[in-house]
From Swiss-Prot:
Residues annotated for Ca(2+) 3 binding in this entry: 440, 442, 444, 446, 451
Keyword Acyltransferase: no
Keywords annotated in UniProt: ATP-binding, Calcium, Cell membrane, Kinase, Lipoprotein, Membrane, Metal-binding, Myristate, Nucleotide-binding, Phosphoprotein, Repeat, Serine/threonine-protein kinase, Transferase
Protein name: Calcium-dependent protein kinase 13
MF terms (GO), sorted A to Z: ATP binding; calcium ion binding; protein serine kinase activity; protein serine/threonine kinase activity
Binding of ATP, residues: 60-68, 83
PROSITE patterns recorded: EF_HAND_1, EF_HAND_2, PROTEIN_KINASE_ATP, PROTEIN_KINASE_DOM, PROTEIN_KINASE_ST
Family annotation (SUPFAM superfamilies): EF-hand, Protein kinase-like (PK-like)
Membrane topology term: Lipid-anchor
Length: 528
């Protein structure tokens, strides 16, 4: 009968065992090939089988080192969360120290309604397990995506909670170092649910005046001094300022299609307050954003000063009018999509059946008022207005620029369908297979750099080699020099935009990025 009769909990438990046991974890000594004893990470906790006291059920989330499961305490039947960190993935002394420090910091910080509570840490031969309170309301990140952005009043409330977490950490000698929307969960699904910080995996203890040089964090939320390898607790306020900017407008203040481009934007420090919806946002909110994103950490606000700022103090009086809609958020998402995905969407558009494309075609024909086969900015603005989608001129211009690969200032039918496909997310596996075959010219089951370059050349531009290399850096996740169908489908389904990119973390990659920035002159270390 196979697996059909087993409970999800049984499957989950077996998955945990398969993840952490077996020959992959076994270590052999140099002499006789005998297995060495499993590594010990936490010296102050008893070694025990977690399943003696807890039932591990369905998977809730997955990170670079750990898998988080729904966890049921056998004695009380309480629902909890368990983050299981595989020892097999702790390959270096630095990795082991990170886990030790994460546990130490969660035990060190006082109990707070804004920080997830660690019930206990335990360890067996295969993993370190952190048993924590369960937060069922989902990520702050996901609520931003679902809404596009918050009202000012809601943004002020969320920002207050985030900065209170920062203040608590700094008061107790901890720098978080990885503040981002994904690391905050709502306790429940209610609108007024408490918000809790959950992940302290990159956090570190500090003493007043102490400086750090290791580049860690998530690209879009990094302070400039992190890139310059000379930073202190002020970086958490910068990251909170980036989150505030996103809460108010739906995109980060510094973004580009490559990590190097993002880093250079951060170092330039130019903040856009002109694009919608910023003209409708209060000056006090903008003032706070500016002071939190102050490039000089010595002049940047402290957590205490942020909480004393008039916009936070008067949060209940802040405007409660929605600042935009989900369509705007999706348009922005499309605007940072790489050229590979844009091309693939156009290929898919050509394969759509008459039924699938009929509604899109009707909309295009209605917008193309002069019947010349293209939609101008004015026609697009008028059409979106007719379809009850209120977009400012800057938003429409951004949409045109995102898909208008030839720089005509207009959209032809194929480009228009590509936009609609992305917004409606109608591409299925059959469409993706056809699009993949278009790029896989030799039919060997992989897209090679030259094949991608040749496809990009069809849309013009002589920089296809550099663009193809950048795309491979992002999409070729197993780094075998080719793009498989699975990697292609993952890119198409999740998007190669800032939301996906913000989840990536790699010490090696950021160290390499820092070297690049020094070589091209972006970093001016002499000013520190």
């Amino acid at each position: 009968m196979g697996n059909c009769c087993r409970s999800p909990a049984a499957v989950a438990r077996e998955d945990v065992k398969s993840n952490y046991s077996g020959h992959d974890h076994a270590r052999k000594d140099a002499a006789g090939g005998k297995k060495s004893a499993p590594i010990r990470v936490l010296s102050d906790v008893p070694k025990e089988n977690i399943e003696d006291r807890y039932l591990l059920d369905r998977e809730l989330g997955r990170g670079e080192f750990g898998v988080t499961y729904l966890c049921i305490e056998r004695s009380s039947r309480d629902l909890l969360a368990c983050k299981s960190i595989s020892k097999r993935k702790l390959r270096t002394a630095v990795d082991i120290e990170d886990v030790k420090r994460e546990v130490a910091i969660m035990k060190h910080l006082p109990k707070s309604s804004s920080i997830v509570t660690l019930k206990e840490a335990c360890e067996d031969d295969n993993a370190v397990h952190l048993v924590m309170e369960l937060c069922e309301g989902g990520e702050l990140f996901d609520r931003i995506v679902a809404r596009g952005h918050y009202t000012e009043r809601a943004a002020a409330g969320v920002t207050k909670t985030i900065v209170e977490v920062v203040q608590l950490c700094h008061k107790h000698g901890v720098i978080h170092r990885d503040l981002k929307p994904e690391n905050f969960l709502f306790a429940n699904k209610k609108e007024n649910s408490p918000l809790k910080a959950i992940d302290f995996g990159l956090s570190i203890f500090f003493k007043p005046g102490e400086k750090f040089s290791e580049i860690v964090g998530s690209p879009y939320y990094m302070a400039p001094e992190v890139l310059k390898r000379n930073y202190g607790p002020e970086i958490d306020i910068w990251s909170a300022g980036v989150i505030l900017y996103i809460l108010l407008c739906g995109v980060p203040p510094f973004w580009a299609e490559s990590e190097q481009g993002v880093a250079q934007a951060i170092l330039r420090g130019v903040i856009d307050f002109k694009r919608e919806p910023w003209p409708n946002i209060s000056e006090t909110a903008k003032n706070l954003v500016r002071q939190m994103l102050e490039p000089d950490p010595k002049r940047r606000l402290t957590a205490k000063q942020v909480l004393e700022h008039p916009w936070i103090q008067n949060a209940k009086k802040a405007p409660n009018v929605p600042l935009g809609d989900v369509v705007k958020s999706r348009l922005k998402q499309f605007s940072v999509m790489n050229r590979f995905k844009r091309k693939a969407l156009r290929v898919i558009a050509e394969f759509l059946s008459t039924e699938e494309v009929e509604d899109i075609k009707v909309m295009f024909n209605k917008m193309d008022t002069d019947n010349d086969g293209i939609v101008s900015i004015e026609e697009l603005k008028a059409g979106l207005r007719d379809f009850s989608t209120q977009l400012a001129e800057s938003e429409v211009q951004m949409l045109i620029e995102a898909v208008d690969t030839k720089g005509k200032g207009t959209l032809d039918y194929g480009e228009f369908v590509a936009v609609s496909l992305h917004l409606q997310k109608v591409a299925n596996d059959e469409h993706l297979r056809k699009a993949f075959s278009y790029f896989d010219k030799d039919g060997n089951g992989y897209i090679l750099p030259q094949e991608l370059c040749d496809a990009l050349k069809e849309d013009g531009g002589d920089d296809c080699v550099d663009v193809a290399n950048d795309i491979f850096q992002e999409v070729d996740t197993d780094k075998d020099g080719r793009i498989s169908y699975e990697e292609f489908a993952a890119m198409m389904k999740t998007g190669t935009d800032w939301r996906k990119a913000s989840r990536h973390y790699s010490r090696g990659r950021f160290n390499s990025l820092s070297i690049k920035l020094m070589k091209d002159g972006s970093l001016n270390l002499g000013n520190e």
